[in-house]
Amino acid sequence: MKKYNLTAVMLLFTLALCAQTPQWESLFNGKNLKGWEKLNGTAEYKVANGEITGISKMGTPNTFLATKKMYADFILEFEFKVADGLNSGVQFRSNSLKEYMNGRVHGYQFEIDPSSRAWTGGIYDEARRGWLYPLTEYPSAQKAFKSGEWNKARIEAIGNSI
């Protein structure tokens, strides 16, 4: 079992619900995983020092940590730090339905990829169409990710736009 600092996935998750009076809502309380559930694989998640850390298990299916609450239009801002050799991401507008591939998580993913292909920030459609927005045509975006450092990201999902 290999341990990776997957604080990436959930540290400082905040969400702005786009309603008549938008208010920021923190998705992670910094203490425990209340309001979250683990889906699919067998990786583990723990909370320490106000951070969520994922512990991957080699050779097992993808594991997802998901909020129990569904959101419509939103702005999601988060910070992440990921170990080399790990491929991760932040799912959004995603589901896990029994009738679809036996509950496999599917939907959009903000890619976190510390490999040399440098696709962090690209959009991948998990368990459906594959790459929707790889960063191969955007070298400046590929250079934005800093391996071994804290990175910031923002996802805006308003109406049909991401």
Regions found by a protein language model. Name each.
Residues M1-P22:
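Bacterial Sec-dependent N-terminal signal peptides
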